[in-house]
């Protein structure tokens, strides 16, 4: 009898925005080894939403311009200001995020991006 073992499929959601998300996902992938099938998806880049798709590149640019980053941090710091930005972004990207979560019917989805706990 020739039975093929189907491995569980684990999807990890990250963004390359400097928080170590990819490093965490890669460490999990290494620890899980060949017991599971994994993929790592950058939610921002794959959001299908202009502006959000560019966030990793914007973040990288801001790392090179700390004074501008500081001004933006000061201007955007606070729950109300954060909500004013995140709510429209969520509305714009939520359909695509739901697709990214369910595509391929993963057995487990691990969100390693604290900004996007959906």
Kindly label every feature range from the protein language model:
Residues 1-46:
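N-terminal subdomain of nucleotide-sugar transferases
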Residues 14-15, 112-114:
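Structural motif
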Residues 27-100:
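Conserved N-terminal ligand/cofactor-binding loop architecture of enzyme catalytic domains
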Residues 94-113:
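Short N-terminal targeting/anchoring amphipathic segment
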Residues 116-118:
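Conserved small/polar residues in nucleotide/adenosyl-binding loops
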């Amino acid at each position: 009898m020739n039975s093929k073992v189907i491995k569980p499929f684990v999807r990890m959601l990250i963004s390359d925005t400097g928080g170590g998300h990819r490093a965490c996902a890669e460490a999990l992938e290494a620890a899980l080894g060949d017991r599971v099938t994994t993929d790592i998806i950058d939610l921002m880049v794959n959001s299908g939403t202009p502006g959000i798709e560019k966030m990793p590149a914007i973040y990288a640019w801001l790392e090179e311009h700390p004074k501008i980053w500081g001004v933006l941090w000061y201007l955007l710091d606070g729950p109300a200001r954060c909500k004013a930005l995140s709510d429209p972004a969520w509305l714009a990207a939520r359909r695509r995020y739901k697709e990214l979560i369910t595509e391929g019917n993963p057995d487990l989805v691990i969100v390693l991006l604290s900004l996007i706990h959906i």
